[in-house]
């Protein structure tokens, strides 16, 4: 199915499972160590870690990455559709090397030949940071989006970057 592994930060006993939560009675003694993810392929490790998308559906990232793109491309939606949000832009400005490393892993796992960052023109610092970080990455490009709302919506991003109507 489309499920994903779920982890807890507390050792204990599961005492109740409801539609929207899992109740754990914590052990009196909590261990400091964590249970490591078993070594394996990058895709297997993403699946084992229970990584999910940040959208409301929590779609399993392993399912997305498990698609063989056969030399296709990945779109990175950094448009920040909602006017008050800045988390994507902040990640690019502060952790650009890690973001690009994640994109390269995603390309490797999914067999993508190219990746495109979709980002609004108004985010000049993030755009400049990306340009500098990508100067030696010919397979990863930047597509500047217009500064209009709701330009972060996925169909609008696909239309703007690829000229495809979904």
Where are these regions (language model features)?
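Glycine- and charge-enriched low-complexity intrinsically disordered segments
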Residues: 18-49
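Histidine-anchored nucleotide/phosphate-binding helix
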Residues: 93-109
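Short amphipathic alpha-helices and their capping/turn segments at secondary-structure boundaries
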Residues: 57-71
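Gly-rich Lys/Arg/Thr-decorated short loops/hinges at beta-loop-alpha junctions or inter-strand turns
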Residues: 74-88
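Generic structural motif
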Residues: 1, 6-16
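Generic secondary-structure signature for well-ordered alpha-helical cores
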Residues: 47-51, 56, 79-80, 104-112, ...
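Hydrophobic alpha-helical positions that pack around
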Residues: 113-166
């Amino acid at each position: 199915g489309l499920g994903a592994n779920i982890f807890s930060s507390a050792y204990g006993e599961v005492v109740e499972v409801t539609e929207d939560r899992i109740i754990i009675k914590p052990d009196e003694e909590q261990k400091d160590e964590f249970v490591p993810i078993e070594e394996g392929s990058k895709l297997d490790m993403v699946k084992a870690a229970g990584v999910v998308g940040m959208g409301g559906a929590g779609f399993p990232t392993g399912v997305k990455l498990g698609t063989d793109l056969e030399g296709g491309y990945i779109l990175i939606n950094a448009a920040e559709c909602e006017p008050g949000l800045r988390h994507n832009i902040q990640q690019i400005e502060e952790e650009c090397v890690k973001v690009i490393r994640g994109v390269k892993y995603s390309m490797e796992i999914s067999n993508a030949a190219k990746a495109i960052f979709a980002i609004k023109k108004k985010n000049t610092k993030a755009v400049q940071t990306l340009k500098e970080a990508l100067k030696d990455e010919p397979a990863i490009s930047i597509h500047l989006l217009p500064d209009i709302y709701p330009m972060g919506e996925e169909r609008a991003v696909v239309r703007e970057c690829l000229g495809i109507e979904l």
